[in-house]
C-alpha cells in the first residue's frame, strides 16, 4: 500500500507540474504574441516552434485559412494555408485563429489541473487504464 501511495504521489506531482507548466507557458506566449501585435515586442517568428509544440501538447487542431490571390492573366490561385505556419502574419483572420488557439490551450491545461484533484478522474483512470494504455501504444481497442 505504501508503494502504491508513493507511485500515486509521483504521478500526481508529474501531472500537476506538466499542466501548470503548460498553462504558464501558454500565458507567456500569449503575452508575447499580444506585444508583437501591438508593435511593442520582438518578431513572433522566434517563438513559432515552441508555440507549435505547445499547441500539439494541448491537442489544438491546426486551423486552416482559405487564401485567394491573383496570379495574372485573369487567373486566381486558391489554397488553404495553416495558421500555425503563418503565426507572424498580422492578418485579421490569422490573429483571430491564433487567439482562439491560445484560449483552447489555456483551457486544456486548466482542465488538466482541475482533473488532478478530482477523485472521479482518478477512479475513471483506474477503470479504463487498459484501454488508455492500448490507445497510447497505438493498439486497436477492438
Listing of model-derived features with the role each one plays in the protein:
Residues 78-142:
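Membrane-proximal, non-transmembrane alpha-helical segments
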Residues 1-9:
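Feature marks short, highly hydrophobic, charge-poor N-terminal signal-anchor/signal peptide-like helices
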Residues 48-82:
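Structured domain cores in non-transmembrane regions
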Residues 24-58:
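Membrane-interface amphipathic/juxtamembrane segments adjacent to transmembrane helices
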Residues 9-29, 58, 62:
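Hydrophobic alpha-helical membrane-embedded segments
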Amino acid at each position: 500500500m505504501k508503494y502504491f501511495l508513493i507511485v500515486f504521489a509521483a504521478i500526481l506531482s508529474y501531472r500537476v507540474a506538466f499542466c501548470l507548466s503548460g498553462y504558464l507557458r501558454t500565458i507567456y506566449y500569449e503575452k508575447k504574441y499580444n506585444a508583437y501585435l501591438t508593435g511593442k515586442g520582438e518578431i513572433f517568428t522566434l517563438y513559432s516552434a515552441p508555440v507549435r509544440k505547445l499547441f500539439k501538447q494541448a491537442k489544438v487542431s491546426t486551423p486552416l485559412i482559405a487564401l485567394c490571390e491573383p496570379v495574372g492573366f485573369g487567373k486566381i490561385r486558391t489554397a488553404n494555408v495553416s495558421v500555425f505556419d503563418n503565426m507572424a502574419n498580422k492578418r485579421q483572420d490569422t490573429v483571430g485563429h491564433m487567439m482562439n488557439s491560445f484560449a483552447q490551450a489555456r483551457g486544456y491545461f486548466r482542465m488538466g489541473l482541475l482533473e488532478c484533484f478530482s477523485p472521479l478522474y482518478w477512479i475513471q483512470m483506474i477503470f479504463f487504464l487498459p484501454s488508455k494504455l492500448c490507445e497510447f501504444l497505438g493498439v486497436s481497442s477492438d
